[in-house]
């Protein structure tokens, strides 16, 4: 599946999505723009050391959880590219999709690892 197919498939399966900014003190202007684009959909911004597919040791990152709606889908789609483009400094990292609290699609961008949870 390509990026757009994954986004569309997840729109049917999921109602939330998240991404990660590992170093909030070193956020790029592109990442700031993306945070602004999704500000109306924000459910939660938390600093933590783990999220689906990743566990940090001795560090934390900001995980942003959003409502996944038709409009959010359209914004993600308009950003174009591929899942591998979701990496600092161009975009936040590790785009994941959930049904309520349950991860459905997980990406570990820096390892080029993407999968649906069974």
Regions found by a protein language model. Name each.
Residues 1-118:
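Structured alpha/beta or helical-core interaction and ligand-binding surfaces enriched in interleaved
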